[in-house]
């Protein structure tokens, strides 16, 4: 394990704020807010800035050891919808893809999928990525279910990050968790393997 002044690598995983009461089976893949560190990993929480301060300290400690920090990000779905989503409460149903009956599309297999094809959602994701890179000095991003993001959106994400750091690393899972409208016509970027084992 890589050890820092704020803990080990294993303690650092799942650092984005996620909504989950039962943490017995959760790796932080139910994001509630994309832009805040998960406060449950904070040591001796005394004020609201402890989560951000300790995360920055941890990343700095990794960098001092020559270790790049790749953040596992989940921009393909959120922990909830409606009153369970800060995004739905801000702009009802705008942040999510809807099916032809007006229901939440579920290409993530988690109850919803984020509409990165909507201009303001795409801009918000780019701003979020830039926030993590500029304010926390993240070196790269691994996208969960990247197959739910349009190729053009991923290109724009990369270009925005490349402007900050030409050495940025961006990669992700080239599949979705279910059937999605975004996958139509993108067979070259998706895997049709029922149980991907990391080989393509």
Summary of predicted features, one role per range:
Residues 29, 139, 145-200:
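Active-site-proximal helices and loops of the catalytic beta/alpha 8
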Residues 1-136, 153-165, 169:
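Substrate-binding/active-site clefts of carbohydrate-active enzymes
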């Amino acid at each position: 394990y890589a050890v820092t002044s704020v803990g080990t690598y294993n303690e650092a995983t799942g650092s984005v704020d996620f909504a989950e009461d039962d943490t017995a089976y959760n790796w932080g893949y139910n994001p509630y807010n994309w832009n805040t560190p998960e406060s449950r990993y904070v040591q001796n929480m005394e004020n609201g800035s402890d989560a951000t301060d300790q995360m920055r300290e941890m990343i700095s400690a990794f960098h001092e050891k020559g270790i790049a920090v790749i953040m596992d990000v989940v921009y393909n779905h959120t922990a909830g919808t409606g009153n369970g989503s800060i995004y739905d409460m801000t702009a009802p149903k705008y942040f999510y893809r809807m099916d032809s009956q007006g229901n939440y599309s579920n290409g993530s297999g988690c109850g919803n999928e984020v509409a990165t094809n909507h201009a303001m959602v795409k801009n918000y994701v780019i701003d979020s990525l830039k926030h993590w890179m500029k304010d926390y000095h993240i070196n790269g991003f691994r996208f969960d279910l990247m197959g739910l993001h349009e190729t053009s959106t991923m290109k724009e994400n990369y270009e925005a990050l490349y402007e900050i750091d030409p050495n940025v690393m961006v990669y992700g899972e080239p599949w979705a968790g279910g059937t999605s409208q975004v996958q139509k016509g993108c067979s070259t970027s998706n895997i049709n393997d029922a149980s991907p084992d990391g080989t393509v």
